[in-house]
């Protein structure tokens, strides 16, 4: 999915919040929040498993896919945003 802007009579048509969120992930934004990545992963069918034993690392699982573990810290490191970007790109090509 490519970010887009539509021009209508000289003014910009606002992208939806969802499109903006995907655009930020695809551009590997440095200010992503855990809940934003969670929202995207869950929308693609991943299920979040809560950590045990006081850990801050949440694991997202989906049948037939490699689990993704993301720590709940701010800001989210680029490595974890790249993991979610790969999910988006693989889902969009299906």
Segments from the language model and where they lie:
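Basic helix-extension-helix modules of the SAP/HeH family
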Residues: 14, 20, 55, 66-69, ...
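Basic/aromatic recognition patch in beta-strand/loop cores that engages polyanionic ligands
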Residues: 38-76
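Generic N-terminal leader/processing signal
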Residues: 7, 12-15, 60, 75-76, ...
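A charge-rich, low-complexity, intrinsically flexible signal that marks solvent-exposed coils, linkers
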Residues: 12-40, 87
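Intrinsically disordered, low-complexity and often Lys/Arg-enriched segments
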Residues: 1-15, 90-94
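C-terminal structural segments of small proteins and small subunits
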Residues: 73-94
């Amino acid at each position: 999915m490519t970010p887009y802007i539509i021009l209508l009579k000289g003014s910009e048509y606002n992208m939806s919040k969802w499109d903006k969120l995907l655009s930020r992930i695809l551009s590997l934004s440095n200010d992503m929040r855990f809940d934003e990545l969670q929202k995207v992963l869950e929308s693609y069918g991943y299920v979040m498993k809560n950590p045990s034993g006081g850990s801050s690392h949440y694991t997202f699982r989906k049948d037939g896919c490699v689990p993704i573990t993301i720590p709940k810290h701010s800001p989210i490191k680029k490595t974890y945003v790249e993991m979610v970007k790969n999910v988006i790109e693989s889902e969009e090509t299906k």
